[in-house]
Amino acid sequence: MDHSMSKKLHDEALLHIVGGVNSPSRSNKGVGGGIPVTMERASGAYFYDVDGNKYIDYLAAFGPIITGHAHPHITEAITKAAQNGVLYGTPTKHEITFAKMLKEAIPSLEKVRFTNSGTEAVMTTIRVARAYTGRDKIIKFAGCYHGHFDLVLVEAGSGPSTLGIPDSAGVTKSTAEEVITVPFNDLDSFKEALAIWGDQVAAVLVEPIVGNFGMVAPEDGFLEAVNELAHVNGSLVIYDEVITAFRFMYGGAQNYLGVIPDLTAMGKIIGGGLPIGAYGGRIDIMEKVAPLGPAYQAGTHAGNPASILSGIACLEVLQEEGLYERFEKYGSMLKDGIEKAAAKHNIAVTVNQIVGALTVYFTEDPVTNYAEAGATNGELFGRFFKGMLEEGINLAPSKYEAWFITSAHSEADILETIQAVDTVFGKMVQDN
């Protein structure tokens, strides 16, 4: 494929934008470098770049675009918002409609508050949990991404008995020491952390199904035990459903798994492609939020009509009968096709697939936590990513990220993708 215009634009972007991108995940650093493709437009399941190339898209903007690009119903809602004014700074009736829709879909959301992003939503749930419990520390799980605010840019110390250390320049040591990080799916480490730090722990922050070192499901009984142990300890449980809400069913991963948190943070899908976040939970906890309580949260753009109307339209699309069954069918088809192609070419892969989301790891071993995901072959994934791009398949540029199937993907798209996988695996073997 010709990418000369993408290269030209990236060179220009480097002169004006830090690193040439507005989010580091777009830089292709995770796949060994190379020029990121600059897209011109998107429609349905497809991207079209500035050089005129067409791609089947599984990036889905890192998750939000579950209905495909430029879905007519969502586009109509956004157009209506633009015509009537996109920002008021006052209440609107649409906020009420959307809050009711979220509450009906995810019953643990007894009260809801809108924010501008998933990062803001997670950040505020932690503040509210601290206000409710009177405690300061949180427990999180290694490798789970919860946004880019200081408190969650923390990596594990040497074990559950040690406090966290900064995972980014600019995060203070004192902030990192408010966080205890333990491995996902490791109940013994979680118990150890609670035994040592329990009386200081305000909340346990959990991705109920991990989406940020690939799609990794909780082992049987893990989330139930986390809930029980946290509550015995007087700590709250926060589910970060920024990736998972409405991903696997019309509702949250908590509905899908049957395990209920005290607070939930959301983003991505619920905006229909526009920036949004939301959080909610038990009434007695949510009443700690201003103006009813002492935990302050505000935002000029929070609940803006454009994002709210886009979100309402997105959820209306997701109520289509049989949609999630189709996600499951196509997800299973992709997993099966990738595994067969890998076996044909004697390439070791593990595919973690949950409904319409999957991750392809270059390893023969199961992946159930961040350490196992980190041990997979990133060099092979980088070659695979670049090969798939040349075959017209757009993936996330990181071995840790998921593929997302949208309502716009067809069976023909899935079959074409499987053929591309077979072709790329064949070339990878030849190159060796």
From Swiss-Prot:
Lineage: superkingdom: Bacteria
Pfam family for this entry, one: Aminotran_3
Reaction(s) catalysed by this chain's protein: (S)-4-amino-5-oxopentanoate = 5-aminolevulinate
Taxonomic path: Bacteria, Bacillati, Bacillota, Bacilli, Bacillales
Record-linked InterPro entries: 4pyrrol_synth_GluAld_NH2Trfase, Aminotrans_3, Aminotrans_3_PPA_site, PyrdxlP-dep_Trfase, PyrdxlP-dep_Trfase_major, PyrdxlP-dep_Trfase_small
Cellular-component GO terms for this entry: cytoplasm
Cofactor(s) it depends on: pyridoxal 5'-phosphate
Subcellular location: Cytoplasm
Record-stated family: Belongs to the class-III pyridoxal-phosphate-dependent aminotransferase family. HemL subfamily.
Record EC number: 5.4.3.8
Enzyme class of the recorded protein, top EC level: isomerase
An example molecular function term from Gene Ontology annotations: pyridoxal phosphate binding
Modified residues (N6-(pyridoxal phosphate)lysine): K268
UniProt pathway annotation: Porphyrin-containing compound metabolism; protoporphyrin-IX biosynthesis; 5-aminolevulinate from L-glutamyl-tRNA(Glu): step 2/2
Subunit architecture: Homodimer.
Biological process annotations from GO: protoporphyrinogen IX biosynthetic process
Protein name: Glutamate-1-semialdehyde 2,1-aminomutase 2
Keywords for the protein's UniProt record, in alphabetical order: Cytoplasm, Isomerase, Porphyrin biosynthesis, Pyridoxal phosphate
Gene3D superfamilies: Aspartate Aminotransferase, domain 1 (3.90.1150.10), Type I PLP-dependent aspartate aminotransferase-like (Major domain) (3.40.640.10)
